[in-house]
């Protein structure tokens, strides 16, 4: 595989998988909204991008063979703070992959699919 794109590269899962994913492709393009993701591995390139920006996602996914989409906000937040990255952002990744002719997308479903207890339930 020539080009693999990873979204959410600064997150918990993305940061753990960056190094192993470099072994699957000639080029790993790691992306996140964070300014920095630390030291890059051999074969890895970092592109700071907002999932909610369709034009940015189209550019990042250009010529990609595969996308591993882990980018999202996983904290308890008001809906409007989640809308851009979690809903619009996921749509943009799928739409960009379709436009680029990407044949494989790996997607980790939201933790909210099974419900998320309020943080207050664990405090006190």
List the model feature ranges, each with a label.
Residues 35-43:
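Short loop/helix-cap segments at secondary-structure boundaries that form the rim of catalytic
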Residues 92-124:
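Conserved Rossmann-fold NAD(P)-dependent oxidoreductase catalytic core, especially the SDR/UDP-sugar
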Residues 7, 31, 67-71, 105-111:
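SDR active-site strand-loop-helix element
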Residues 4-24:
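N-terminal Rossmann NAD(P)H-binding glycine-rich loop of SDR-like oxidoreductase domains
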Residues 44, 49-85, 114-116:
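NAD(P)H-binding glycine-rich loop region in Rossmannoid oxidoreductase-like domains
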């Amino acid at each position: 595989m020539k080009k693999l794109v990873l979204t959410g590269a600064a997150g918990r899962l993305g940061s753990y998988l960056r190094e192993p994913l470099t072994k699957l492709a000639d080029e790993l393009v790691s992306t996140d909204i964070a300014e920095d993701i630390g030291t890059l591995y051999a074969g890895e390139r970092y592109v700071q991008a907002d999932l909610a920006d369709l034009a940015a996602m189209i550019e990042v996914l250009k010529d990609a063979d595969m996308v591993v989409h882990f980018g999202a906000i996983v904290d308890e937040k008001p809906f409007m703070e989640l809308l851009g990255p979690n809903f619009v952002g996921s749509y943009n990744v799928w739409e960009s992959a379709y436009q680029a002719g990407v044949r494989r997308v790996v997607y980790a479903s939201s933790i909210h699919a099974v419900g998320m207890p309020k943080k207050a339930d664990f405090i006190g």
